[in-house]
Swiss-Prot record:
Function, in words: Probably functions as a manganese efflux pump.
Family the entry assigns: Belongs to the MntP (TC 9.B.29) family.
Any GO CC annotation of this UniProt entry: plasma membrane
Keywords from the named record: Cell membrane, Ion transport, Manganese, Membrane, Transmembrane, Transmembrane helix, Transport
Principal subcellular localization: membrane
Membrane-spanning ranges: 1-21, 40-60, 64-84, 105-127, 131-153, 166-186
Gene assigned in the entry: mntP
Subcellular location as annotated: Cell membrane
UniProt key word Cytoplasm: no
Lineage of producing organism: Bacteria, Bacillati, Actinomycetota, Actinomycetes, Bifidobacteriales
Stated name of the protein: Putative manganese efflux pump MntP
InterPro entries (UniProt xref): Mntp/YtaF (IPR003810), Put_MntP (IPR022929)
Length: 188
């Protein structure tokens, strides 16, 4: 289960990784403090939003346990498919983005990149896992990937943005399929 949570953490961090690469492309001089701010904003929100989804879904879990595997699969497949689709769309908003790292620039980005994580939290409510460990792993993973994304964007340009987003989406879809197939008895 720990590997599965780590894979989910890596997958949901791909949006922030891609945005961080975009920010890295626009920065003339990247400071360590900028990377730390980015890691804290993105990691914090990616940890908070699944927690919100988890507690909201836990309240209603007794009403949906008969179809929980379909909910998990549907949400993860939807998020993953959306990530793959977005990788192939032209993202003019990120191209115009300023390299600022203050709250006025980071808050909207952190919220926008973390909205999908609410659905991940909803799916967590139907899994047997430690929610606190899960959100800590997601937050740390996202923080590391977003800080790395800044540096990669600064050094290598936009070459890895699309493949990272596609990989993250595919992993989420595969985890959703795994949960579904386990429940249906296809996997032991």
């Amino acid at each position: 289960m720990l590997i599965q949570i780590l894979l989910i953490g890596v997958s949901v961090s791909m949006d922030t990784f891609a945005v961080s690469i975009g920010k890295g492309l626009t920065v003339k001089k990247l400071r360590g403090l900028d990377a730390l701010k980015t890691a804290l904003w993105f990691g914090g929100f990616q940890a908070l939003f699944p927690l919100l989804g988890y507690f909201a879904a836990s309240t209603f879990s007794k009403y949906v346990t008969a179809v929980d595997h379909w909910i998990i699969f549907g949400l993860l497949a939807l998020i993953g498919g959306n990530m793959v689709r977005e990788a192939f769309e032209e993202d003019e908003e990120n191209a115009k983005e300023t390299p600022e790292f203050d709250w006025k620039h980071m808050l909207p980005l952190a919220v926008a990149c973390s909205i999908d994580a609410v659905a991940v939290g909803v799916s967590f409510a139907f899994m047997t896992l430690n929610i606190w460990l899960s959100v800590v792993i997601i937050g740390i993973t996202t923080g590391l990937f977003s800080a790395a994304g800044l540096y990669i964007g600064r050094v290598f340009g936009s070459r890895w943005q699309k493949p990272a987003q596609i990989a993250g989406g595919v992993v989420l879809i595969l985890i959703g399929l795994k949960v579904l197939f386990e429940h249906l008895g296809f996997l032991g």
